[in-house]
Swiss-Prot record:
PANTHER family tied to this protein: NASCENT POLYPEPTIDE ASSOCIATED COMPLEX ALPHA SUBUNIT-RELATED
Occurrences of domain UBA (ranges): 120-159
Organism from which the protein derives: Dictyostelium discoideum
Superkingdom, natural source: Eukaryota
Protein name per UniProt: Nascent polypeptide-associated complex subunit alpha
Keyword Magnesium carried by entry: no
Major site of localization recorded for this protein: cytoplasm
Domain called NAC-A/B: residue spans: 10-75
Role, per record: Component of the nascent polypeptide-associated complex (NAC), a dynamic component of the ribosomal exit tunnel, protecting the emerging polypeptides from interaction with other cytoplasmic proteins to ensure appropriate nascent protein targeting. The NAC complex also promotes mitochondrial protein import by enhancing productive ribosome interactions with the outer mitochondrial membrane and blocks the inappropriate interaction of ribosomes translating non-secretory nascent polypeptides with translocation sites in the membrane of the endoplasmic reticulum.
Location of the protein in the cell: Cytoplasm; Nucleus
Subunit structure: Part of the nascent polypeptide-associated complex (NAC), consisting of nacA and nacB.
Single GO term (MF): unfolded protein binding
Transmembrane segments: none
Length: 160
């Protein structure tokens, strides 16, 4: 075996493993990934973990290299990149004639202009509608409930 294949065990890890044996923790096989979800959408991911279970089966000890994945910040970064013009174009059907296209644009514009947004930014409503496929009314209600927080609104609409 090459030196790079041999795993170095630290003194602290060695003591921890001895203590786990004394407590009766048994190794659990066939676990390839451990994901722990924390508040605010933060995920702690351990790839190739060593997992030990207590005899009661309710407590686990996980060894391995971990990484953090913040879903909320990724979603928040993606939301400003959304282009409202692309959203409106995607929502409209393909025109069969130029005249029909102009008429449908006027109808959509009138419908959007006549809708009561209740103090919510129409662009925010369009972005959330695109991400969640929810109705305009539901999006406005959710944005009001979340105090115009786009990320919270998207998460609430997609989890319900």
């Amino acid at each position: 075996m090459a030196d790079s294949d041999v795993k170095k065990v630290t003194k602290g890890e060695k003591k921890t493993r001895e203590a786990m044996k004394k407590l009766g923790l048994a190794p659990v096989s066939d676990i390839f990934r451990v994901t722990i979800k924390q508040k605010e959408g933060v995920l702690v991911v351990v790839a190739e973990p060593e997992v030990y279970a207590s005899p009661s089966g309710e407590t686990y000890v996980v060894f391995g290299d971990h990484s953090f994945d913040d879903i909320a910040s990724r979603l928040q970064k993606a939301v400003p990149k959304a282009n409202v013009d692309d959203i409106v174009k995607a929502a409209m059907p393909a025109p069969t004639a130029v005249k029909e296209s102009e008429e449908s644009e006027e109808i959509v514009a009138q419908a959007v202009d006549s809708f009561d947004y209740k103090g919510v930014n129409p662009k925010d409503v369009e972005v959330v509608m695109k991400e969640t496929k929810a109705s305009r009314e539901k999006v406005v209600e959710t944005l009001i409930a979340t105090k115009n927080d786009l990320v919270s609104a998207v998460l609430e609409l997609t989890t319900n």
